[in-house]
A protein has these predicted regions:
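A polyanion-binding, active-site-adjacent surface
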Residues: 13-152, 156-159
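Single conserved hydrophobic/aromatic residue that forms the stacking wall/gate
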Residues: 1-8, 12
Length: 162
């Protein structure tokens, strides 16, 4: 939509910041080609649920553009273990061996973080670089859809206006 393209043009401004960080030899997660994975895997039309987190995991190999998700063969982080425990306790869903939530994304769950990037080993480091404008616009546009479900995990996520 036109509103999202306006927000997308703002993303260009983030690129300059990220290039600068990389030129200073800082490691940024997720890798560049994976920053927008949540949108590549879950289209606007297919989105039924938004799970909103704070920022990507900041450890090596963890973040891949889906909030709370890690790739196969990566240790499941404590936050995701807690989510799995709650799903098991409340809904009797078996706790998986992998923390890869790609299957959720393909089923219409938009796994979005308030900030789409983070510096290695520095949680919440990109909170103030402007990602909020973009993610606020995404949430605003999705708000036009009927019967959307929002799950807000983390303090920053809970501050979002729905």
């Amino acid at each position: 939509t036109l509103e999202l393209s306006s927000a997308a043009s703002d993303v260009y401004k983030r690129q300059e910041f990220l290039r600068n960080q990389i030129s200073q030899r800082k490691t940024i997660y997720p890798p560049g080609k994976e920053i927008f994975n949540c949108f590549n895997l879950t289209s606007y039309e297919d989105t039924k649920v938004v799970i909103l987190g704070q920022d990507p995991y900041h450890g090596a190999g963890q973040a891949h553009g889906l909030s709370f998700s890690v790739k196969d063969n990566i240790s499941i982080p404590p936050s995701l273990k807690n989510i799995f425990k709650e799903l098991n306790s409340d809904l009797k869903i078996k706790i998986p061996c992998s923390g890869n939530l790609t299957s959720w994304a393909l089923e219409g769950v938009l796994l979005l973080n308030s900030s789409l990037t983070v510096e290695s080993n520095n949680p919440n480091s990109h909170q103030n670089i402007g990602w909020n404008f973009f993610t606020d616009k995404v949430i605003e546009v999705l708000g036009n859809k009927k019967d959307m479900v929002y799950i807000l995990w983390g303090k920053n996520a809970q501050l979002k206006k729905l």
